[in-house]
Amino acid sequence: MESRIGLVLILSLFTAACGARVIHVLESVPAEYQLKLAKLPRVWVAGFATGKKPEFDLNLETVRLIRTQLRTWSSAQVIQAEPLTIDTEQRLSDVAYWRRLGEEHGRPLIVTGTVKLLLAPPQVVQRGIRTIYLPLAGRTLEATVVIIDGGSGQVLSTRKLPSRMRYGVGRFSSGLSLYFQMMDQAMPDWFGAITGTTPVSSEPNHS
């Protein structure tokens, strides 16, 4: 645990010194996830299909974030490689494609899937007998995690994560800021999908 705390401090100091975005590392994860994370083999977080023209590089940010969390909370060797650009969701079930890439990367457990950041509907507030729409910036995060055997290229599991919605005000209302806030909340869902653990809670989050 001391080594994990040290890693969190190093990451924070490094990103602060470089002026880069700080990736928040979870302070704790459910015990049932920790047991499974400790047994993970080599893992390759390959890349994600993100749909058309996301407002920032959603694939890159998701790959970076998941790799950072796995390096912190698992003993697996997390492969460092350029994120794949997955142009269609059909590619996720292309056995020959993943078998070839799996061989090139030493037959790891492959983490891929889809991640979409969508505009949220206007927020509705009831004040007495009046209903008003607040023009707050909001986003909805939708993700499906696909786990692939790097030796055979076969899909081992596919799990759609609970969707999340969040609104922000001022400097916390950008798509990137809201994305990081929702991913922070969703990380136990990601760990559950990667390790094959039954979700602690499958209720969607709206805030």
What label would you give each PLM region?
Residues 101, 131-135:
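Outer-membrane beta-barrel proteins
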Residues 124-128, 172:
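Outer-membrane beta-barrel translocator domains and adjoining extracellular loop/strand segments
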Residues 91, 122-125:
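Short, well-ordered secondary-structure micro-motifs
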Residues 39-117, 150, 154-158, 181, ...:
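N-terminal segment of the mature soluble domain
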Residues 10-13, 35, 102:
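Structural motif
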Residues 1-16:
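Sec-dependent bacterial lipoprotein signal peptides
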